[in-house]
Regions:
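Bacterial N-terminal signal peptides that target proteins for export
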Residues: 1-7
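Extracytosolic ligand-binding ectodomains
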Residues: 2, 21-360
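Sec-dependent N-terminal signal peptides
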Residues: 7-14
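C-terminal motif of bacterial Sec signal peptides marking the signal peptidase cleavage site
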Residues: 16-19
Length: 360
């Protein structure tokens, strides 16, 4: 007979798929009716002996660096998942432990934090946020047999590398976002575009995917300008984008360095050109962060979303209950929730913690 706490956990885990599907995907709902057989006829069940150790997970989000304005909101999605799991009885009869670490959107910072959380017993990591950061620390996680599930790694590069079964992501590849962004440009009647992008795995992957999809749809890419991720001055890159003379500009940026791009763009009069942004700057506070007031009004963009339905509604109600401002969601917070739930499902299903989580 199943433990009632396990049934409660299953109800919580039904929220998991909030972010894994696209807006056009339909998930069939299946009702399962359960009944208890009489004691005299109940067949013996095969069970897995639960681990005596608690499930220890780590949240490795950018609490400093270029994505610091997004990190806490994403991490809150993971914390919400742990809170709900523990309210339902935990995993294998014990509360899940969540350790918070800072990835800094920087390989060196993230590696230090990863080693620290591993030393504290972390068996799974929700993170990192930045694609390049995850690429920098993945080999260390694999060597330690620690599962990494990222809520926001969108670089197409992850599809190509050998992850040894210790890496997954709950956000879609930018091959999809590039196609959607190109479609948006075409729908708006844009025929020529210039792109300014970060020179990292995220930026290059999305810029190339967008350019390929836009050209396949009959558009023309005037120029692609990449900026160094550690740069502090971007005027020359902005000037180069402006010289392209395109009808629209695509910005594949992060908040802090993105402000370094948008400020000279404002000074050079380029913000009068239609801009299309991506998930890296999906932050309601971007204009304030950049000190640009209403200059960004009218910008359009793309970002991974969640399929409409009961699961999405339930997540947003729960997230609003724990967020400081009552916001129902935050970019990649649903995917962070899913990442933790997936690791928890594996641990619960297999009655284990540690490297065996990867087999789930």
């Amino acid at each position: 007979m199943k433990n009632r706490k396990a049934l409660a956990l299953i109800a919580i885990l039904a929220l998991v798929a909030v972010a894994c599907g696209g807006a056009d995907e339909v998930v069939d709902e299946v009702e399962v009716e359960t009944t208890e057989a009489p004691a005299t006829t109940e067949a013996p069940a095969t069970t897995v002996a639960p681990s005596a150790d608690p499930l220890v997970l780590a949240s490795l989000m950018p609490l400093s660096g270029d994505l610091a304005s997004l990190g806490p909101g994403i991490a809150l999605g993971a914390a919400l998942a742990v809170e709900q799991i523990n309210a339902a009885g935990g995993i294998n009869g014990q509360p899940v432990v969540l350790i918070e670490g800072d990835s800094g959107c920087d390989g060196a910072v993230a590696l230090t934090s990863l080693n620290d959380v591993i030393a504290q017993g972390a068996q799974g990591v929700m993170g990192a946020a930045c694609s390049g950061t995850s690429l920098a620390i993945l080999d260390t996680a694999i060597a330690a047999e620690v599962v990494m599930v990222s809520p926001s790694n969108t670089s197409p590069q992850f599809t190509k590398i050998d992850k040894k079964g210790f890496y997954a992501r709950t956000a879609p590849s930018d091959l999809l976002q590039g196609d959607v962004l190109a479609s948006l440009l075409v729908e708006d009647g844009v025929q020529t575009v210039s792109i300014i992008s970060r020179a990292d795995s995220y930026g290059r992957g999305l810029a190339e995917a967008t350019a390929a999809a836009f050209e396949a749809a009959g558009g023309t890419v005037k120029t692609i300008v990449y900026h160094a991720t550690d740069a502090t001055e971007f005027s020359s890159e902005v000037t180069a984008v402006g010289k392209g003379g395109a009808e629209a500009i695509v910005g594949i940026l992060f908040p802090e360095t993105g402000c370094g791009v948008l400020q000279p763009a404002f000074e050079q009069g380029l913000l009068d050109t239609p801009w299309y942004m991506t998930d890296g700057v999906k932050d309601a506070g971007l204009a304030s962060l950049c000190g640009l007031g209403t200059a960004l009004d009218g910008f359009k963009g793309t970002a991974p979303g969640s399929a409409a339905g009961e699961a999405k509604d339930a997540f947003e109600a729960a997230y609003a209950g724990v967020s400081a401002d009552g916001s129902p969601t935050f970019i990649f917070a649903p995917q962070a929730y899913d990442a933790v739930m997936l690791m928890a499902i594996s641990a619960a299903a297999n009655g284990v913690t540690g490297p065996e989580i990867a087999s789930g």
